[in-house]
Every structure is written in C-alpha cells, then in structure tokens.
Amino acid sequence: MPKTSKEMVAEADATVPRVSGTEAKAMLGKPGVVFVDLREPAEIAASGKVPGALAIPRGLLEFRADREAATPDPTLTGAKTVVLYCASGGRAALAGKTLQELGYGDVKNLARFQDWVEAGGEAEKT
C-alpha cells in the first residue's frame, strides 16, 4: 500500500535524532560538524542561515552527498556529524533518512531554522 508524505516524514522522524536549537548552537564550529540548510535559495535570502551552513536545496542533496556522484560536496562528504534543518522540519527529516541510507552515521535533525533563531542563534545573511 502506498505511503502518504505525512507517513514518510513520520517514519524518517523516528530514525533521525532531533536536536534542539540550544544543542545545535553548542555543536556549531566543532571539528567534523557540518550544518546543511535544505531550504530553497529564496527562503534563505529572506531569513539568513546558520553561520557557515552549506546551502543545499533538498532536491539536490543526494547528488551532493553521494561520494560517488558526479558533483559531491567535499565538505559534506568529509563530515563526521551532519546537522540538517529546513523551514518546518519535514525536508530535514526526509533528508536525514536519505543520508543514513547513503552511509552517513551521525545525522541530526535540528528541524526548523526558527528553532535555531529562538535559541539565540545568529543568522548569516546571504
């Protein structure tokens, strides 16, 4: 039986650990930790992003995260811990499950960029 998108997000949420904005702030700048903003460029331009985060729209993630793809991102493929976020958490959950399937061992879901901001995190303007 086909799954709904809501079911897919719930399944991904169950496998990708969540981190709070406060926990994410403590991770920023640590060796091997990479933040990935999965929002579209216009969304990032409107609100900024976590300082130093890679901006990889959800639709391009597999091609940038796959070490054997034509266009892997060396910053992402070399990460020990990947912290994902988007606007509402759904894209981050699905992306986290995808990264796990690609062999990434330590993937975290910050969920919403707003969680970062509400925890006092700075927004880097692009």
Tell me the role of every PLM-derived stretch.
Residues 1-33, 41-83, 88-126:
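Rhodanese-like catalytic fold shared by cysteine-dependent sulfurtransferases
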Residues 36:
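Active-site flanking residues adjacent to catalytic metal/cofactor-binding acidic residues
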